[in-house]
Regions:
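Patatin-like phospholipase
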Residues: 1-41, 49-295
Length: 295
């Protein structure tokens, strides 16, 4: 396999924990040595953010195992009852606190912009985060190239804002941003054909092949399923055409919104990621073609 230059991490809520297992396998096989940038949407954006600001996969595995994800919820009555005006029942305040803690723990200024990050941490991979610009009904890329003066934590907060659950974030121009998964949960789609050739994408069967029946157990999964249904038909062809560059993770009946997941359930997700990556690397398309010399 040609060493990839970038990783594209899809959204998927709690399923995003499986990305860590897949990345661990790629790292163990030496496939992350040439990575220059990480692209992420929603949960994938949060993980990409963590990696770029300096967290190792080992640190993330430990952090995720002990972290209580229910702590990111901020369901205060006054916020919930203002839903009509704020467009969400959770203002994302705890998410923002989490981003601040993550940045501070790695010695990264909490108010750092994409431009400042590229200048201060030039040796780190670049970061491209995707959210949905509701005001323009389009996908928004936050990056050094497109939004140099935007805060990293603003971009991540925008990308993880599940519509109607978390309030959207607003920029100086008045544009509102929500979860990038509303338009496309997998940033691999945003790349040119040449870029895709040097990219490994990681996503989930649960959100790429909707003809595989999945039981919907709560309102959050319902919202996510509605969003995924909107772009499934146009995406199916791309997944098949670029299967040699995409790791598909099977997560069985795991819920994307199970914030109360036990350490065993988290471990199972990360192991699912490892299994998918191992299968991907032994597939025929991952093996280099043998060259023969004329006698």
């Amino acid at each position: 396999m040609i060493p990839p230059l970038r990783m594209a991490l899809s959204g998927g809520g709690m399923l995003g924990l499986a990305h860590i297992g897949a990345l661990e396998v790629l790292q163990e096989r030496g496939h992350l040595k040439c990575i220059k940038e990480y692209l992420g949407t929603s949960a994938g954006a949060l993980l990409a953010f963590c990696i770029c600001i300096g967290y190792t996969l080992s640190e993330l595995r430990t952090l995720i195992t002990v972290f209580n994800f229910t702590k990111i919820q901020n369901l205060e009555p006054e916020i919930m009852f203002s839903f009509i005006e704020s467009y969400g029942i959770d203002n994302g305040a705890n998410f923002e606190k989490l981003f601040t803690v993550l940045l501070r723990a790695k010695g990264v200024p909490t108010e750092i912009t994409f431009r400042e990050f590229s200048e201060k941490f030039a040796d780190r991979p670049a970061l491209r985060i995707f959210a949905t610009d509701v005001s323009r009904s389009s996908l928004k890329e936050f990056s050094l190239k497109n939004t140099p003066d935007v805060l990293l934590k603003f971009a991540v907060r925008a990308s993880v804002s599940i519509p109607m659950i978390f309030t959207p974030v607003e920029d100086a121009s008045g544009s509102l941003y929500v979860d990038g998964g509303v338009v496309s949960h997998f940033p691999f789609h945003t790349l040119t054909e040449e870029e895709r050739k040097r990219t490994i994408g990681i996503t989930f069967y649960k959100y790429t092949f909707l003809n595989e029946s999945t039981k919907i157990t709560n309102i959050l999964e319902y919202i996510q399923r509605v969003c995924n249904s909107a772009y499934y038909q146009k995406d199916e062809r791309l997944y098949k055409e670029w299967s040699r560059q995409i790791i598909m993770i099977r997560t069985s009946n795991a819920s994307s919104m199970n914030f109360e997941a036990s350490s065993e359930e988290k471990e199972a997700l990360m192991n699912a990621g490892r299994t998918a990556a191992e299968e991907f690397l032994v597939a025929p398309h991952s093996k280099p073609k043998r060259r023969y010399s004329l006698p």
